Amino acid sequence: MRESGILMPVSSLPGPYGIGCFGKAAFQFVDFLSAAGQTIWQLLPLSPTGYGDSPYQSCSAFAGNPYFVDLETLEKEGLLTAADLKAESWGKDPLEVDYGTLYVSRFAVLRKAYAAWRSQCAGLHGCAYYYPDDYYAFTLANEDWLDDYALYMALKAANKMKNWVEWDAPYRRRDKAALAAFAAENEEEIGFWKFVQYKFSVQWQAVKAYANEKGVQILGDIPIYVSADSVDAWVGGKLFELDADGRFARVAGCPPDYFSADGQLWGNPLYDWAYHKKTGYAWWVRRVRHALGIYDLLRIDHFRGFDTYWAIPATSTTARTGKWENGPGMELFDALEAALGKPPIIAEDLGELFPSVRKLLADSTFPGMKVLQFAFGGGDNEYLPHNHVKNGVVYPGTHDNTTLTDWWENGASQKEKATAAAYLHLTSCKPTAKEVAAVKTAAARTALLRAALGSVADRAIIPMYDWLGLGAEAHLNTPGKLGGNWAWRAKAGFDSKALAAQIEAECVVYCRCNADVQNVK
């Protein structure tokens, strides 16, 4: 079945408290998607943001982002007051996330909510604290990661949020006696981090259930790597190329490509794939199983890294000096299927692709991705719509691309614009520079959107900012740039009935709306 969806980060939803969250705006956006005939809501990772405010550099592969907990829901539960919310600063610009301000204000308010929650639970049933049954169910169901995560975050708080490799040796090396003593002395702090994850889970599951009731699937995102400063690296040990003190000789990244002339030096620890194989890829099975409890569909970032990955000396200042190493290949995906059934994975197969990567994608039968902003460099480019395949997902651009408006006005070369203009019937087949210059941005954007929707690919995902026609102000991420990313927020009222009707009309033409809408139209 042909489908279409919208890429819209939770962080980009409007609201009064500095960042999008699981409150009214999330439910309203689901209503908007349904009204527009869309069947997919694609998200960025819901994990806590880390270095550079990136959701791809998280302190946990399993935890949720505390910033997404809806504060107004906590207020309704009696855990916060209006005065609590007014007492904090939430940033100067409602259209941009101020992560520095948010770090201070959000956690201050969440700690007030936790204190109120503990007060509500104090002395119940003759216990010092008796928490709700669903809290105990949540902690039990997630104990394989939650206990370590909460302990890790409490230790970070006690160590002024330093990287775990800078902690004292007993904690860095996970000495059992030292950790047990710390946990006993910091029970309340550890409980805070569990409380936040509990509220995250309850609120997110309500949003997801509502979306599913409306016929909208949630497409989540799994970064291939974990952060060096993460509970996963601290606990993982033999899963990664680390010694007991967290030192590593090589780190992850990717070679020079369209996005960066120096490549991308991510700095993540590399997996010890030989050890993963010995365990039957148990950690990856746990990770994907957990993700399938949060999302309906999974986009796995940097799919090519499962075939061959770029290993960079830790002392390098750019990614140019790396070398290719072999990944686990189909063995990993066979293990996932044996444990979980065929996982609903979409492979992010962008970048330099060896024939072996293409074979892995074919063997896995996962749909890959096509990005129109890469299509117009000349020749019979694989990203041109006539080269798309049915088992695929087409995008005008991803979160790493700029918006269509900014691409046409500032990003595309003259050759790309001329090629695109001719291909999209905006000019003659061999346009002059004057013809290309006469093409209006709005016309180019509409033509590119329709090219995506008209693709033979089963799924088309359009970023929300491209439906809105926004420019560089909505560019989510510039790879290789530290700071100033992941900040865009939509204006209140962006998800209007008029825009929903426009999107529905466009998608009906290309038979991409949900079945109810398509059959009526």
Feature-to-residue mapping (PLM):
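Surface-exposed amphipathic alpha-helices with a cationic face
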Residues: 34, 204-212, 337, 361-362
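Mature N-terminal, pre-catalytic/accessory segment of carbohydrate-active enzymes
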Residues: 1-37
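Alpha-amylase-like alpha-glycosidases and glucanotransferases acting on alpha-linked glucans and related
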Residues: 9, 18, 53-197, 226-461, ...
